[in-house]
């Protein structure tokens, strides 16, 4: 990714950058962005945007589960060392991870990272089981983390609204598995995490001024994903849904689906909301919401 950013001639990167420049959000969650320890690729990406667009002085990313090796067979194919044997799918550590670009600083001493939470430690976890027992094995479930990428709670200090808490994740697609429905169950529980978080299961949830956003990889009405978790989240009494029912991505063979969400807390006033669809950049749209108090 860094090589392609620095070369400056990758058509997809050019389209992504142009979309960001034209939209000019104050805070941006970037999904599917490769992580590196020094943040070199993210810095180069932000500098590329700043040439003709907003200056994102804050570039934030935590180590993801994507590509984090386990040395176990995590997908039940009898082999180890494959991309699905990592804590989250990845051909290398940091493959297709998450990042935040912001005009405003992150309150780093208040960041909460739940990426290391074991799947089995989620309340009422829906772990995969077959006739032979836990899938793919007891040993795998003993170390399997819930997050395929991460679950972050990140306060951002704004000049006029004070601290705004971002709650973000990128759930695994509920496909590419077998009859045990490992990915479908994990997708469901990655979404259910936020319901538990807002109920205070892990720490005191934010009282006000928060936004839950990310790629949940689950449409409430279409596709293979288990629907109870995403429907419950969209109906949560502390959240509002400014883009209710609007598809956010287009998939070959499936058509338009709603899998990306920006859900502000109910104490916000939603000034406007919308999507920017740029097929050359991504099959996912850029989702935006303009908020005030």
Predicted stretch roles:
Residues 21-22, 50-55, 91-95, 145-148, ...:
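Extracellular/periplasmic catalytic domains that process cell-envelope and extracellular macromolecules
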Residues 1-3, 111-115, 163-173:
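Active-site-proximal beta-strand elements of phosphoester/diester hydrolases
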Residues 10-14, 134-156, 189-202:
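A Trp-anchored, charged/polar loop motif used as the substrate-binding/catalytic surface
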Residues 32-33, 171, 215-217:
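Active-site metal-binding loops of divalent metal-dependent hydrolases
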Residues 103-108, 145-170, 293:
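Beta-strand-turn-beta hairpins that frame and shape the catalytic cleft
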Residues 36-42, 69-71, 175-178, 219-225:
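Extracytoplasmic/secreted cell-surface and envelope-processing proteins
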Residues 105-113, 183-211, 216-293:
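Metal-dependent phosphoester-hydrolase catalytic domains
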